[in-house]
């Protein structure tokens, strides 16, 4: 007897006629006048559930089988057989059903066999993976995670785990969560009245990281090609469907690379991810296309087959100014592009993914390399139809004197970044990298409208349940 997953049965890995054991949860139960019950069982291994044909002669048929409701946990032993009904290829002809866990009160069980609003499901995030949508999102998220590591491994990158607790603000924006063990009721004070962090756990002021980039740069300047993939945190009091306080970031870093090489890798990377998810999660994407976003599959296929357009920020501004469209946000050289501008460029004007390069220096981070014009930095944003910016990257400033100037412009204390400055003192080379918010990627692939549905337990202002 083989313990088999539903995925193994539907993919042909289990031979028809085999005696199998399947373990999972009841989706639905339907009783027949012919003295049978049809129990749909899902184990989460794929989108489909398998139908279990349960005869009335089973010893627990009346006492247990006919009382099964959505969410009950069962172990089924039976024979895998061709299905006589419509809608699926195989079924299990049950020899026994063991009820492992009952749903205490089926009437109040939150995940009923009906469509629930996404707002409601966020309130029961611990149970929402049992729904069709969030089961699909979880499997797609897993597939994309594995594809990230596979792409970099196959292309000679090393995975570096960067710290979550840090003393540095990698973006220079100041929107950071403080980490402290100090007694908030009785804070130690300095002579000037400030908080004396020398009494804190680390002996200095520390935060949750907003990016692993600064740390991973150190390893790029020794191992040539590296990446980090881990949680990051932003204390940005934003309640939009595009922002989370805790999310995962993918950040490769490449030594001896310029902005053009950075953009080339970003294009290869995204196309690899989308190709992989189309190949490996076709069942989940079929459901997404049917129920969430009709164009999901064609959108991803179009992305893979389209060469990315390259355009400079200055030229993008000119196109937007000449578009004749009235935007909600102003279009002016020196202002950052908003989502509506990005989507007009990639959807209405160019019709495919776009890489916008060379942004004004004052709207980008301090570590980006100043161009020869003295006004722009070697930065890029990859814009995708349907979402706008999906990747942000740059060539890093490898010249110590220029880095110091940029840090002064941002009001950053060089003493806090002495270790980062050391990279420019000891064998500095041109290098580049980019960042991709993993949840934004999941949103794009799954056609979701709210990023809080792209992560198992969303953290946002006023929301840290579970």
Curated annotation (Swiss-Prot):
Its EC number is 6.1.1.22. It is found in: Cytoplasm. The keyword Nucleotide-binding applies. One of its GO terms (cellular component) is cytoplasm. It catalyses: tRNA(Asn) + L-asparagine + ATP = L-asparaginyl-tRNA(Asn) + AMP + diphosphate + H(+). InterPro entries: Aa-tRNA-synt_II, aa-tRNA-synth_II, aa-tRNA-synth_II/BPL/LPL, Asn-tRNA-ligase, Asp/Asn-tRNA-synth_IIb, NA-bd_OB-fold, NA-bd_OB_tRNA. GO terms for molecular function: asparagine-tRNA ligase activity; ATP binding; nucleic acid binding. GO terms for biological process: asparaginyl-tRNA aminoacylation. Keywords: Aminoacyl-tRNA synthetase, ATP-binding, Cytoplasm, Ligase, Nucleotide-binding, Protein biosynthesis. The keyword ATP-binding applies. It comes from the Bacteria. Pfam families: tRNA-synt_2 (PF00152), tRNA_anti-codon (PF01336). Homodimer. HAMAP family: Asn_tRNA_synth. Belongs to the class-II aminoacyl-tRNA synthetase family. This is Asparagine--tRNA ligase.
């Amino acid at each position: 007897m083989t313990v088999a997953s539903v995925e193994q049965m539907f993919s042909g890995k289990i031979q028809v006629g085999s005696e199998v054991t399947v373990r999972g949860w009841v989706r639905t139960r339907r009783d027949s006048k012919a003295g049978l019950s049809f129990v749909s069982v899902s184990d989460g291994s794929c989108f489909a559930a398998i139908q279990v044909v349960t005869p009335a002669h089973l010893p627990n048929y009346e006492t247990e089988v006919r009382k099964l409701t959505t969410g009950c946990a069962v172990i089924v032993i039976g024979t895998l057989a061709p299905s006589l009904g419509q809608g699926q290829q195989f079924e299990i002809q049950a020899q026994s059903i063991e009820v492992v866990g009952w749903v205490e009160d089926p009437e109040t069980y939150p995940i009923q066999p009906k469509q629930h609003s996404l707002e409601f499901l966020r309130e029961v995030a611990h149970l929402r993976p049992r729904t069709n949508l969030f089961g699909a999102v979880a499997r797609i998220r897993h597939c994309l995670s594995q594809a990230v590591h596979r792409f970099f491994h196959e292309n000679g990158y090393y995975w570096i785990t960067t710290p979550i607790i840090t003393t540095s603000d990698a973006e220079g924006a100041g929107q950071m969560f403080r980490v402290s063990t100090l007694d908030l009721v009785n804070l130690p004070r300095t002579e000037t009245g400030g908080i004396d962090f020398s009494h804190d756990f680390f002996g200095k002021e520390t935060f949750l990281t907003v990016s692993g980039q600064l740390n991973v740069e150190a390893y790029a300047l020794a191992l040539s090609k590296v990446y980090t993939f881990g949680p990051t945190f932003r204390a940005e009091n934003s309640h939009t469907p595009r922002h989370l306080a805790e999310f995962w970031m993918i950040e490769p870093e490449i030594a001896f690379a310029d902005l053009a090489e950075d953009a080339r890798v970003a294009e290869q990377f995204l196309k690899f991810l989308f190709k992989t998810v189309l190949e490996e999660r076709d069942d989940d994407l079929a459901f997404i296309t049917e129920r969430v976003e009709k164009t999901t599959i064609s959108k991803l296929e179009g992305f893979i087959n389209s060469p990315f357009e390259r355009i400079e920020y200055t030229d993008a501004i000119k196109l937007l100014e000449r578009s004749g469209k009235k935007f909600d946000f102003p279009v002016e050289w020196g202002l950052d592009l908003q989502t509506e501008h990005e989507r007009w460029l990639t959807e209405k004007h160019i019709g495919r993914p776009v890489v916008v390069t060379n942004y004004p220096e004052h709207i980008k981070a301090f570590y980006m390399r100043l161009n020869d014009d003295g006004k722009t930095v070697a930065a890029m944003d990859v814009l995708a139809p349907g979402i706008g910016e999906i990747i942000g990257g740059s060539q890093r400033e490898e010249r110590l004197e220029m880095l110091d100037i940029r840090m002064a412009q941002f009001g950053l204390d060089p003493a806090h970044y002495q270790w980062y400055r050391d990279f420019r003192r000891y064998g500095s080379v041109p290098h580049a990298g980019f960042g991709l918010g993993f949840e934004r990627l999941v949103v794009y692939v799954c056609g979701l409208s709210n990023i809080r549905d792209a992560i198992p337990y969303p953290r946002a202002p006023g929301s840290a349940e579970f």
